[in-house]
Every structure is written in C-alpha cells, then in structure tokens.
Amino acid sequence: MFQDNPLLAQLKQQLHSQTPRAEGVVKATEKGFGFLEVDAQKSYFIPPPQMKKVMHGDRIIAVIHSEKERESAEPEELVEPFLTRFVGKVQGKNDRLAIVPDHPLLKDAIPCRAARGLNHEFKEGDWAVAEMRRHPLKGDRSFYAELTQYITFGDDHFVPWWVTLARHNLEKEAPDGVATEMLDEGLVREDLTALDFVTIDSASTEDMDDALFAKALPDDKLQLIVAIADPTAWIAEGSKLDKAAKIRAFTNYLPGFNIPMLPRELSDDLCSLRANEVRPVLACRMTLSADGTIEDNIEFFAATIESKAKLVYDQVSDWLENTGDWQPESEAIAEQVRLLAQICQRRGEWRHNHALVFKDRPDYRFILGEKGEVLDIVAEPRRIANRIVEEAMIAANICAARVLRDKLGFGIYNVHMGFDPANADALAALLKTHGLHVDAEEVLTLDGFCKLRRELDAQPTGFLDSRIRRFQSFAEISTEPGPHFGLGLEAYATWTSPIRKYGDMINHRLLKAVIKGETATRPQDEITVQMAERRRLNRMAERDVGDWLYARFLKDKAGTDTRFAAEIVDISRGGMRVRLVDNGAIAFIPAPFLHAVRDELVCSQENGTVQIKGETVYKVTDVIDVTIAEVRMETRSIIARPVA
C-alpha cells in the first residue's frame, strides 16, 4: 500500500531537506570519539560508534542531531577520503592480513590483501604501500585495502629511507642510462685549461659542479670566472636521460646518501669538475668594481678547464683564519684563495648595503654507521669558505638573470614577492604595536621590503621577525623574470647546479642559445609546476628521514637529566615546539609541562607567547634548557620538558 506512494516520497524528501547538515573534516582522538571540524570556530562531536564509519582526516557531510542541548554529527556522505595511497606495517599472516597506516592518528588495522601479480608473501612487520578499496560511507560494510608494493622487512636498518621514499613515491636509485659521447652543439670552447681553477666543497662531495678563478685587474677591480659543469653537452633535449631528469627535477639529498637526478657516471664523473681532469664547462666572466658592484661587461661563453685543486671548506676556512695545519699545495693556489676571499668580502658588503644577506644558520650533518645507525649529529657552522662559494654563486646567478632577461625575456627564475598584499595593513598594524612604523604600500616594494628587513635584522632578538613570517608569500619558480625580495634582488635565475637541478639545465640551454645568437623557445609553465612539486616532496622526505633519525639518536636520552639548549620555534594552544640548538632536532613541550593549572596558562600562537598568571614567561626565539621526557618511536616524535 505504501509502495511507490508519491506522498510518502515527498515526505521523506521534505524530512531530508529539513535535517541540518554540515561539511567538514574528521578529527580523531585517542579516546575513540572524534570531532567534525567545520571551520576554525565550529566543530561537532562524533560519538565512538559513528567514528567506525570514518577515518581521521576524511572530508564528509554529516547529519547534525540535537539532543538535550548537545549537538552531535552522524556521518552521511564521503566528500574526500583522507587515505587513498599510503604506507603502513602489515599484521597477520598470508591468509588473514591487515595493515596499520604509518600515521600518528590512525591506529586501527585495516583488513587487506595483496594485489594480483604482487609476488611477495607478506608477513608480520613487513612495510608495504597500500591503496584503499572500500569505505563504509561508500556503501561498503567496512574499510578494506589492497597491498600494491612491498617496501622492506620490519627489522631492516634502512627502514627510515625506504619507507619515506615509498611514502612520497620518490625514486630509490640513480636513473639508468649512460651518455658516452659529447654532442656537437656548434659551440666554440675557449681553452682555459692553463688557468688555476679550484673547486671548494665538502670532503665527501663527488658531484662538483662549480669551479672558480679570480684575477686582480687595474683600478682595484677584480675579475671572477665561474665555470659550471656542462651536462647539456652530453644530454640532448628530449632524450631518455633528459626526460628522466625532467621528472626528478632535483637530486634528492637525504641524510646519509643522495639519489641523483642524472646517472652517477655523469653526476660523479664525466660532468664532475674533478681535479686534474679536463672538463667542458659553461662559464661566466664578470668584473667587480672596488665596492663589489658587478659591472655591465658580463660575458657567458663555453670553455674547457682543468681544476687544479679540490679544496675542502674547513681546511680553506682554517687557513684563512690562521688555524689548523693545512696549507695550499702551491703559491698559485694560495693566491687564488686570497683573491676569492677578497671577492667574497666585497660581494658580501655590496649585498649588505644594496640587497639582503641571510642570517647564518648552521647545517646539521648526520654521521651514520654501516647499518644506518646514528653515530653523531654535528652542527656545521657556515664559515668563510662556504661564504666564498655562496657569494660567487649568487653573483653568477644575478648575471644569468640579467642576461636571460635582457636577451630573451624569459628563463627559469626564482621569484619571491615579499609580503602578500592582502596582509600589508595587518603587517603594518602589528609592527606599529612593537614601535616600528612602516607604510603599508611601501613595504610591498623591493626597496621598502629591504628597508624593513634591515630594521628587523638590527633588532636585539629575532622575535619580531618570527611574528611577521606568516605574512610573507612563498618563493616560486617562474618562466617570467621577477624580483626576489628574500634576496633583495631585481631578478635571480640559477644555473650553477645543473648536475642536481633540472631548471639549471634549462637555463644552460637558453644561455647557450644566447652565446650562439640563436632564437630559443620559452620553457613550458608545466615544468615549473613539476619542479615546485618535486622540491616540496624532496623537502618532506628529508624532514621525515630526519625525524626518524633524531628519534633513534635521542631515544636513550629519554627520562634522563641530560640537558639541551633549545630555541622556541612555535607556540600553539597545545604547547611549544622547540629546536635543539646542538643537533637541530624538533621537540614538543605539551602545555601541562609548562604549568600545572590550565586556567592560569595562555599559549598564544597569534602573539607567539606563553603567559602564566598574566606574565609572559616564554616567547618564540627564546632559548631555554630542556630535558627529553619521552621519545615515541612509532610516531617519531620527541617530547621535552623545560628544566625547572
């Protein structure tokens, strides 16, 4: 009687349309219940039985029920699942398998089976890549996944590397292929093999892509020739090797080893500017005036060179600082080092006065044993030899940016627009509360940005600098010339690392077209998208492996009285994030460790401060002493507490 009853259907429709609904993201808790977060202000409670239908991070539409003043959400429709492809640890044996996703808030095992054609017998503890196949909100009875790739066994010492690379879907090894002979590019190469070129790198570096030569000129001027390895002399555009490099976009540098963009025969041998080996290069000859200005007679040309010495950063720095027992092998090499130090001094002063100079942060290096165990983590401060290379490279990249802009009007440029215009007024208001007066319009210009940065650098602490960081836009890769506010430069295009950056290879090809007087094709914008995405993935992979190794390294310090100096890098409602000064590890200090009475504690991300009873006790950039309370290996997180 009620079947196909139009009135009943209408009533159902009416009820459905009158029921309140909300779209948001599921946030799980460790207690079984969860929340539907609609926006920063509004969230709804999801009871434990309803949480069985969803997963942390799912974007869903839910029906909102109100009972006795309390609202709760009942998941109804899946908008976007949180998990699609993921990595995890396998449980059980071949006939009954499940996988636990490797994610801090996903604790439940998901039933699964191996995909057809995957020839591996999975066992307890194996790491695998899986893809979700079923979801309760899609009408399935339960969650279900398919194992699509075996990563490695549970006790493999190199789990941090293999799992991280699989998670981000990145290559594990160097590309195949070999380039046996140089291309005929129709370039005339200047023979500079008699000049005393030197390379300065870490002792372990094999892929040397830059060599330097300096010469004193009359009128207190200096000449610098920057010679860069020439992989495009071996790799034709559109060839198999070129396509592989285009996909990788960068060499991926992880703690302990790298995965090169080019085959190792090229990156570490044929293209590497090894000492006493003749190599083809793309070179830039520039003249620096007494105050460090790059004069207009910039010249790009093809050449052959023979590096006369592979110098090492620390040894060169020691010698220039009159310490250590290393000596340059000849007076000619010593003279090169002295001239390069002079160039560094001039260019550093020029950038300080006319552009911007980054504050020096140390590099942290993991020292690993045979089995991937962390023997030590050392902070390597940026010393004079590092700055010599950095100043030479920045100068060379400024030259390329100018030449490509003026001769072609395009290239692969690093562009940074400073502050987002939408934030200019809020930025000016924030600075005003700290006694700095800036014009909201002026700060959006390159000069205005540089002026503000210099004022911030002159502040006694980095606190204000950290406050305005959220107003800054991100650096981008563009085919269009544009300013780089972060460096304080009108234009910046890198070409000095073509062995490890595909964008630099593109700029090499464009510079060669300029040298030959040929027309060149503008690079496709898609390539900049691929490069930006790869840069993001490589950085995430480096961070993930680092987190794993830091957790391994600090595990035996948990619960001990060992003190670490730590800089506060971020404050949130839940506590503070700190960076250990000696080794670079990031640790979290939960709010209850800061003060026992929650009502007397205010942790403000907005202000970058922690107040107890109305008094500011901690602020971002403060350095405090901490001990390690706990290291959670399954989430690779380090929990610290302040030393009382």
From Swiss-Prot:
It catalyses: Exonucleolytic cleavage in the 3'- to 5'-direction to yield nucleoside 5'-phosphates. One of its GO terms (cellular component) is cytosol. Acetylated at Lys-501 by PatZ. Deacetylated by CobB. GO terms for molecular function: 3'-5' exonuclease activity; exoribonuclease II activity; RNA binding. Residues 189-516 form the RNB domain. Gene3D superfamilies: 2.40.50.640, Nucleic acid-binding proteins. Optimum temperature is 50 degrees Celsius. InterPro entries: CSD, NA-bd_OB-fold, RNase_B_OB_dom, RNase_II, RNase_II/R, RNase_II/R_CS, RNase_II/RNase_R, RNR_Ribonuclease. It comes from Escherichia coli (strain K12). Disruption phenotype: In the presence of wild-type RNase PH (rph) 80-90% reduction in viability in stationary phase (96 hours of growth) at 31 and 42 degrees Celsius or when cells are rapidly starved at 42 degrees Celsius; if rph is also absent there is no visible phenotype under these 3 growth conditions. Its absence leads to extensive degradation of rRNA. The modification N6-acetyllysine is found at K501. Residues 561-643 form the S1 motif domain. Involved in mRNA degradation. Hydrolyzes single-stranded polyribonucleotides processively in the 3' to 5' direction. RNases 2 and R (rnr) contribute to rRNA degradation during starvation, while RNase R and PNPase (pnp) are the major contributors to quality control of rRNA during steady state growth. This RNase is required to decrease expression of RNase PH (rnp) at 42 degrees Celsius during starvation, which in turn represses rRNA degradation. Its EC number is 3.1.13.1. The keyword Zinc does not apply. Its main location: cytoplasm. Optimum pH is 7.5-9.5. This is Exoribonuclease 2. Keywords: Acetylation, Cytoplasm, Exonuclease, Hydrolase, Nuclease, RNA-binding. NCBIfam families: 3_prime_RNase, PRK05054.1, RNase_B. Changing K501 to Q/R: Strong decrease in acetylation. It is found in: Cytoplasm.
